[in-house]
Amino acid sequence: MTNTTKTPWLIVAAFLFTASVYGQKPAPKSSAGPKPVIFAVLDGGKRVEPIASVSAGKLAAYEFGEEVQNKAFASLYYKPKSSYSLIFGGAADGTLAIVKSNIGTECGGASADTVSRTVKAKLTGLVMALATNTKINTSTAAYRRKPSVEERRGIEKLVSAEFAKQGASAAAVKTLRYHNLTALDVEDDGQPEFIGSYWIAPTSGERRLLFFIAEQDANGKIQFSMSEHSVVKADDVMSGDVKDLDTGVGHELLLDVLDYDADGVREIFTIGRAFEGNNYYVYKRGEGGNWSKVYETYSYRCAF
């Protein structure tokens, strides 16, 4: 499935969009104790933001805004030295400890400062992760790696063809670049899935972005199972300069995978970095192997 949009979802996100969508319900405002929560691990493991709580296999967003709600969340989840499992490759890879809450501080949003202690993961640049207090299935092994040279070659042929199909010139396709390309195994079956974020620069005032999930079959053939193409021009960007997208702002990027509903298939968590906050998305594999977006929320930080 391929979608094309003129104005990307993540550049002009409204900061009022703090509740979940796709039939998910807001998390209850009162609680006797911490509920299972999934966090995005950002800035090299030095900061977290909440993505959703988990209840009966469903995701729900927290509503921030009222001071009492914000303080309640911080007291439940952001107490100094509180510890969470750090998820990398769909399995636990060390821990993440809270240093201090940023809720109520200038541009702190719903975040907290953290310290990560990983086993294998190297959280640098746009390599991010998840953290959670949910019960983790310790019987499944972590799987997250860079694609092989052959795999990358096959994927980039698909990416180039998709950009051309969407109307990009041959010269523009030659400017092919990426922010992320990662191999994962969502079903623990030894057949990798690939999550990628590619872009081209047809002109100095235009960028074209492609986010995708690709599959590899038993014969080694790779094909897209989901992709989203966006055309971005200066008027679509809050800063008015498309070059700001070259750093990763405005792109949908992988966080990690986690089987939050215990159905044996890891869901894919992504982030869309915007100028005033972050968009978060979750994809779930359905019948027939198709991927669909089952959850979406926005975390406002401060005005641009």
Predicted segments — roles?
Residues 10-19:
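Bacterial N-terminal signal peptides
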